[in-house]
Amino acid sequence: METRFPQQSQQTPASTNRRRPFKHEDYPCRRQQRSSTLYVLIFLAIFLSKFTNQLLLSLLEAVIRTVTTLQQLLT
């Protein structure tokens, strides 16, 4: 025969159970980290846009050169 003990729930006071609101002063480097991440993302966006524009331009020039050489060979 088993004897079962009722589970005792630990009662915590409401003051310790309640969380205090988030304050930026608690994490001073969080804002700096966020702004530096934003700068890195902006730099990457500008760099990649210039890189992709240049890449597309060089691909277009290669296609034009190929078409003109094929056109010269066929005539």
From Swiss-Prot:
Membrane topology, record value: Single-pass membrane protein
Protein's cellular compartments: Host cell inner membrane; Host cell outer membrane
Region (Disordered): 1-29
GO biological process: killing of cells of another organism
Highest taxon of source: Viruses
Any one Gene Ontology cellular component term annotated for this protein: membrane
Pfam assignment, any one: Phage_MS2_lysis
Residue ranges with Polar residues bias: 1-16
Principal localisation: host cell
Record field: transmembrane: 38-60
The entry's keywords: Cytolysis, Host cell inner membrane, Host cell lysis by virus, Host cell membrane, Host cell outer membrane, Host membrane, Membrane, Transmembrane, Transmembrane helix, Viral release from host cell
Expression induction: Lysis protein synthesis only occurs when the overlapping capsid gene is translated. Initiation at the lysis gene is prevented by a hairpin structure that sequesters the ribosomal binding site. The ribosome, terminating at the capsid reading frame, covers part of the lysis hairpin, thereby destabilizing the secondary structure and allowing the reading of the lysis gene.
Record flagged with keyword Translocase: no
Protein family (similarity comment): Belongs to the Leviviricetes lysis protein family.
Task of the protein: Induces the formation of specific membrane adhesion sites between the inner and outer membranes, apparently leading to host cell lysis. Lysis may be performed via activation of host murein hydrolases.
Protein name: Lysis protein
Organism this protein belongs to: Escherichia phage MS2 (Bacteriophage MS2)
